[in-house]
Design a protein with these regions (language model features):
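Membrane-interface helix termini and inter-helical loops of multi-pass transporters
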Residues: 125-138
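Alpha-helical transmembrane segments and their cytosolic interface
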Residues: 5, 137-176
Length: 176
């Protein structure tokens, strides 16, 4: 097993702190919640930029736990999309690159995962709390069409952000 360096520990701590701060802000300011998911996802890429999978897992688990502790466990449904998809997506992208998975196959699997995560979120978070009753088939069709199209844009953006994060961390660590 590879030894974790001080830089990787620092990047993991920074990723956890940034992600937690963003998710707490998004949770208490509902209009910023989706933006908080996205930016927290980018912040979690910091340990992955140095190839630290253990640091990433630490940052992800710490982010989820601290956000629930700071906001209260009653906000679990607001954090559900982050916990079941957005927080884990950078790791899956990194594994896709490391093991050279076919792009179309990886996209198909990740799109189904995204659609499933959004369906679970709709069932638990919105389906139980909204007064408007949407037909089940309409929600599934909407998720499979619009959700997959939005996921394509999101996945493309996350891959571009990954390249920028890797370049930024590489420059910062070379400046010793």
């Amino acid at each position: 097993m590879k030894k974790i360096t001080a830089y990787e520990i620092a990047l993991s701590g920074l990723a956890a702190a940034l992600s937690t701060s963003l998710l707490v802000l998004g949770t208490v300011t509902p209009i910023l919640l989706f933006t908080a998911y996205l930016v927290a996802c980018v912040a979690l890429m910091l340990p992955l930029s140095r190839g630290s999978y253990a640091g990433y897992v630490f940052a992800f688990l710490t982010t989820g736990l601290l956000t629930l502790l700071f906001c209260g466990f009653s906000f679990l449904f607001e954090l559900l999309p982050f916990l079941i998809f957005f927080g884990l997506h950078p790791l899956v992208n990194e594994l896709q690159i490391k093991y050279k998975w076919k792009k179309w196959l990886a996209f198909f699997i990740k799109a189904l995962w995204f659609d499933g995560a959004m369906y679970v979120t709709w069932r638990f978070a919105f389906g139980m709390t909204t007064v408007v009753a949407l037909p089940e088939v309409a929600v599934v069709v909407l998720l499979l069409t619009l959700g997959t199209a939005l996921f394509w844009l999101y996945d493309y953006t996350v891959f571009k952000a990954r390249a920028q994060i890797n370049a930024l961390v590489g420059r910062l660590l070379r400046k010793k």
